[in-house]
């Protein structure tokens, strides 16, 4: 039989607990299913708490701040940045430390984390009295984000997209002529010759260094 993993805080209160693996249903809190290639598909399932609120998980195209009852894909997409760290109103933070594509389901009756292809179960949990304490413990485990440079806090000019060097510079020159402050101008995709060839296309951007020098002089 499986041991049931339970996490408590310093007050003896249960923060998170795996589902029971006993009974006629023969459920497994940690379920490994062999797949082709030698890896496993993995499900890890915990009991849910009706009074719990869940926050975090990065950037998704959805309207909910409280993630309770939400299902999220654990994968990056255009405008979707999956950061598999969730902070609970019960006073803990949970990091799913697994690079595999998967899903998480914060259901009403249980919470399930899924990895489609993995070699092992790996997650990190921390507790704290405040969100700041939990965030600090998370940062100490994963690394602190660098301070954003000052120019990154100003106005960004971005569009989809500038098709050549002269078009980009003409927009920047217009800002300068109108005395409008601008800190960043984004040269978005397809400035390269072919996908995966990350350099300026010389036909449309004949002198990138001169372009950068002029932008810096503004």
List each model region and its residues:
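Aromatic-lined carbohydrate-binding/catalytic grooves of carbohydrate-active enzymes
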Residues: 146-218
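Catalytic and substrate-binding clefts that recognize carbohydrates or anionic sugar/phosphate headgroups
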Residues: 1-149, 159-160, 165, 172-177
